[in-house]
Swiss-Prot record:
It comes from Caenorhabditis elegans. Transmembrane segments: none annotated. PANTHER family: FMRFAMIDE-LIKE NEUROPEPTIDES 1, FMRFAMIDE-RELATED PEPTIDES. Residues 1-19 form the signal peptide. Coiled coil: none annotated. One of its GO terms (cellular component) is extracellular region. This is FMRFamide-like neuropeptides 9. The gene is flp-9.
Amino acid sequence: MNQFYALFLVACIAAMANAYEEPDLDALAEFCGKESNRKYCDQIAQLATQHAIGINQEQVRMEKRKPSFVRFGKRSGYPLVIDDEEMRMDKRKPSFVRFGRK
């Protein structure tokens, strides 16, 4: 039972440490095999599982899509200045502009 527990802890810690650097699994198994270090290994295993669960939840979330159309209302007749040339924007009917697929 102690060997299985140590292997489980090693696997959890290895999963957490993979993001940072290559762990020394033999030293970790030896450290967790001692009774005096059991509480530290429990804390490490708990942190590793919480970290793994957090990563899985982030990957599962899907990104929200942008709306496929934008509605433009009537524009006011304010002057638009581009390169020192004043252009007048006329009012027009509301329209839909699609982005992407037709």
